[in-house]
Amino acid sequence: FRYEFPYQKNLSYFVIKEELTQFALAGDHTAWWIPGDYDTQEYNYVESRLSEISSKMEAVINPNDSQTPFSTNGVQTSLQMRTDKGLYINIHEAALIEYPCMHLNLDPATFTFTSHLTPDAQGWKGRMQTPCNTPWRTIQVAPSATAQLASRMILNLNEPCALEDTDWIKPVKYIGVW
């Protein structure tokens, strides 16, 4: 799903102050996660129960790496989970264009994640002009992790490649500071 803002005579430019999309889960699933952080994704993934995220957060942080999570219960997407019955659930986003990325903040009492958008310097979550769309919010459920990987949903929700000729693109190895 995503939110669409059609052109309106009296609404042209507007500010997103917050997005409160919620994902209510049915239990204390096993999750593979990294901390929600505005500045880096350079963390080792943690495998834990959802209820253990806050207690494991401090051990994941390396103060020498400029890591600053926004919350002790905040994680980045894509968030992969497995239920006790063996179903795999993934929460992510697609078509992220001119919009802040979505993190997820967990309420451990209810196992409900609320979207948390990366703010700009003024604390605003987004500046938009109609007509426009938010990114797609995706929830995938599959019987196995390999079925999750085989899904083309995220690819298909993104815009098609704007380049007509991609033959010149070749895979390479890179070592260095990016």
Regions picked out by a protein language model, each given a short descriptive name:
Residues 170-178:
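N-terminal small/glycine-rich loop or linker at the start of catalytic domains
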Residues 1-167:
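N-terminal accessory beta-strand-rich subdomains and adjacent acidic, glycine-rich linkers
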